Design a protein with these regions (language model features):
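N-terminal domain-start signal
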Residues: 1-87, 91-95
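Long, highly charged low-complexity segments enriched in Glu/Asp and Lys/Arg with interspersed Ser/Thr
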Residues: 14-17, 21, 34-37, 93-119, ...
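Long, charge-patterned amphipathic interaction tracts in eukaryotic proteins
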Residues: 31, 65, 69, 76-135
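Generic detector of well-ordered alpha-helical segments enriched in charged/polar residues
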Residues: 33-44, 56, 60, 72, ...
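Short, solvent-exposed segments of well-ordered alpha helices
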Residues: 53, 57, 80, 124-127, ...
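Long, hydrophobic, amphipathic alpha-helical segments used as structural scaffolds
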Residues: 70, 101-108, 141-144, 148-152, ...
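Conserved binding-pocket/active-site segment within a compact domain
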Residues: 113-175
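Glycine-rich, aromatic-bearing surface loops/beta-hairpins
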Residues: 161-203
Length: 203
């Protein structure tokens, strides 16, 4: 068991830069970086230390409580291969599937024939359907807080690779190609983050 598992869980306080300024605080970029990493670490530790399904579900759905914009202010500018950057990408992925489950399913289904091994790693139903895809991304995020975090990241990476392949196949054009490439890049970052977590170096 790593040092991460021994630390006492703390409830993260989600004070974005704009919220801090609204309460009279001065904006400090260095402090913002510190807050980003501390909140990400606290969120993961709270879920993993609690070992409580109810806590896990609240953390999976935290965007529903505080809004994606709050997480964006906290985490979106952090490196992709950092804990806050990694969590940001996972929550964005979940939010996209929640907002466009039919599109996500169509692109995922189209990508399976190009990336069969990734489909197996992601663990989606076959054939995929919108409800199943939505459950899948929740299950992946749930693994961050109550399972093997590195495996959760590898599943998210595999899911992203399948969607990337499907999007490139069924949506020709430079914009879709760029989006597909971005998804592929995110998959590489998630895979790298999984390796870092296993090495105790994802902060």
């Amino acid at each position: 068991m790593s040092d991460r598992e021994h630390r006492s869980p703390r409830r993260p306080a989600f004070f974005s830069p704009s919220a801090l300024e609204a309460h009279g605080g001065a904006y400090d970029p260095t402090e913002q970086i510190h807050v980003a990493h501390e909140t990400a670490m606290a969120l993961v530790h709270a879920g993993r230390a609690a070992a409580d399904p109810a806590v896990t579900e609240r953390l999976v759905a935290i965007v529903d409580q505080i809004g994606l914009s709050t997480l964006a202010e906290l985490w979106s500018q952090r490196p992709a291969r950092s804990l806050p950057g990694t969590l940001w990408r996972l929550y964005v992925l979940r939010e996209w599937v929640r907002r466009a489950p039919a599109d996500a399913t169509r692109e995922y289904a189209a990508g399976i024939r190009f990336t069969g091994p990734n489909h197996a790693v992601a663990g989606a139903s076959d054939p995929p359907d919108p409800d199943g895809i939505s459950r899948l991304v929740d299950e992946i995020l749930r693994g961050v807080f109550s399972g093997d975090l590195a495996v959760a990241l590898e599943r998210a990476a595999a899911f992203s690779r399948v969607v990337s392949a499907g999007r490139a196949d069924i949506s020709p054009g430079s914009t879709s190609a760029e989006h597909a490439a971005n998804l592929l890049g995110m998959a590489e970052d998630l895979t790298a983050s999984a390796r870092l977590w296993r090495a105790g170096a994802l902060d």
